[in-house]
Design a protein with these regions (language model features):
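HhH-family (HhH-GPD) DNA N-glycosylase catalytic core used in base-excision repair
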Residues: 1-235
């Protein structure tokens, strides 16, 4: 299939060219054939976005012999990578994600972008076509938005968190440039000092927006797995 990705003012389409499965041992299979469609000058951005310079096979091999559960999880999720996404987009997206399903999160983020983001023409595709995209809104674009307006976008109780975070980011109290330079522990403490960001959301931002791969977000599903596969077995 083919998938579309928007980050900042950039647009990418990524496509699996064929089902090129390769069996590397008794339990592991790989599919590595894919193609990017983007502007040539943006290729390095997307290579970093998809973390293509990291050896994920080495990560998997480091746990394979010690942990049969993670071995099977790695097989099931073969090809998954930790994306280098925009920190501001991740802050709002994971605040929105609280108590929401993935389709509802996508719907809310798209509504926010349509109403407050900037339209932009980007990405030369096949046949020299250009794609018109709507970028995720910046802090300054959202700084004056009211809680009532956000509630109308079905953001519920999260609206009050978003209002405060946008004001903090636009006013400089939430310093995104400084956040990008922080280590994991410092970034966690800094993020949790802001209204609406707790332990799990801060870990999600650190992992997917700041690429601190030591971050470990624990939601209901992860907690169930930990209890079932690890804590209970130790007793």
């Amino acid at each position: 299939g083919r998938f579309s990705v928007i980050s900042q003012e950039r647009y990418l389409e990524i496509e699996q060219l064929e089902c090129d499965w390769k069996q590397t041992d008794e339990t592991r299979f790989e599919a590595k054939t894919f193609a990017f469609y983007c502007k040539k000058e943006e290729l390095s951005f997307w290579e970093r976005y998809f973390d293509l310079d990291q050896d994920y096979e080495a990560y998997i091999n480091s746990v394979r012999k010690r942990d049969s559960y993670l071995q099977h999880a790695a097989q099931a999720g073969s090809g998954i990578r930790i994306l280098n996404q925009d920190p501001w987009e991740m802050i709002l997206t994971f605040v929105i994600s609280q108590q929401k399903t993935i389709p509802k999160i996508r719907e809310a983020v798209e509504a926010l972008s349509r109403q407050f983001g900037t339209e932009h023409r980007s990405a030369v595709l096949r046949g020299s076509q250009e794609k018109e995209i709507t970028c995720f809104p910046t802090p300054s674009q959202l700084a004056e938005v009211s809680e009532e307006t956000l509630r109308a976008l079905k953001l519920g109780y999260r609206a009050k968190y978003i209002v405060r975070l946008c004001q903090d980011a636009a006013g400089g109290r939430l310093n995104l440039d400084a956040l990008k330079t922080m280590g994991y522990e410092e970034a966690m403490a800094y993020l949790k000092s802001f209204y609406g960001i707790g332990e799990k959301v801060a870990n999600c931002i650190c992992l997917f927006g700041l690429h601190h791969i030591e971050a470990f977000p624990v939601d209901t599903w992860i907690e169930q797995i930990l209890m079932q596969e690890y804590y209970r077995k130790k007793k």
